[in-house]
Amino acid sequence: MHLRFIFEALSDLSTPGEYMRYYRQLRGLTTRQLAEKLNIVPATVLGYEQRRFPIPYDIAVLLAKELQIPESLLFDDFCIFISAPYTEILHTVRKRHGLNQGDFAESAGISPSIYAKWESGSRRPSRKMYQQLKAIYPEI
């Protein structure tokens, strides 16, 4: 009887989707089973694993809990920003540039009222808005 070890070495993994697939398989879960636990469709699980689209922050947090792994393995730069906490990062970068909220937001093409909600923590930036901010302020 021959057994084949199907799991790649952890050192070979580099993306959140690869970690997701590795630990899903390690836990003996099918894409359908994991999808049901996350309340999403199996095709979405495959999309995350195959890097067709990024894992949203809330899904990454839930997924880490389900797979019993550190959230950081499933976080891309946007998720790291959101968990940092992003309110402190935004405030610090804005102050470093010596700008008020309105000027900081307008220089990135963002509504000042929306930006104020981000910095106060009453609203979270979308991935698209994060990328827009990062294009102007790379240190974010």
Describe the predicted segments one by one.
Residues 84-131, 135:
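Helix-turn-helix/homeodomain-like alpha-helical modules used for DNA recognition
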Residues 58-73, 127-140:
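DNA major-groove recognition helix of helix-turn-helix/homeodomain DNA-binding modules
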Residues 18-37, 62, 88-103, 132:
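Short basic helix-loop element that most often maps to the first helix and adjoining turn
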Residues 2-26, 76-96:
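A short, Lys/Arg-rich alpha-helix, primarily the initiator
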Residues 1-5, 13, 37, 56, ...:
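Primarily N-terminal secretory
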